From Swiss-Prot:
Main location: secreted
Gene3D superfamilies, sorted: Crustacean CHH/MIH/GIH neurohormone (1.10.2010.10)
Keywords: Amidation, Disulfide bond, Hormone, Neuropeptide, Secreted, Signal
Location of this chain's protein in the cell: Secreted
GO molecular function: neuropeptide hormone activity
Pfam families linked: Crust_neurohorm (PF01147)
Name the record gives this protein: Molt-inhibiting hormone
PROSITE patterns xrefs: CHH_MIH_GIH
Signal peptide bounds: 1-29
Matching InterPro entries: Crust_neurhormone_CS, Crust_neurohorm, Crust_neurohorm_sf, Hyperglycemic, Hyperglycemic2
């Protein structure tokens, strides 16, 4: 009897973990989609642009920098400042084109 109760609790815990995991995953995906409507099918571009913000955050260690860089699907002034700080200004035309693709549908 005790073994059956323990099994029941184990099964319930597994289901709880699965449900919470799915909810968190869907919320994260929804945030990325709302912030950058063109990200679907363009994950590689999104990764390249996101990398600039992550590198900038790693240099300055300020969460406001990371949030500001990503704001408006990378259309913020902070993103340009991060490109400058990462010494990637010569790549700005490429990033501008990629950000335009990620912002498609706005």
């Amino acid at each position: 009897m005790v073994n059956q109760v323990a099994q029941c609790f184990t099964v319930r815990r597994v289901w709880l973990v699965v449900v919470v995991g799915l909810l968190v995953h869907q919320t994260t995906a929804r945030y990325v989609f709302e912030e950058c409507p063109g990200v679907m099918g363009n994950r590689a571009l999104h990764g390249k642009v996101t990398r600039v913000c992550e590198d900038c955050y790693n240099v300055f260690r300020d969460t406001d920098v990371l949030a500001g860089c990503r704001k408006g699907c990378f259309s913020s002034e902070m993103f340009k400042l991060c490109l400058l700080a990462m010494e990637r200004v010569e790549e700005f035309p490429d990033f501008k084109r990629w950000i335009g693709i990620l912002n498609a549908g706005r």
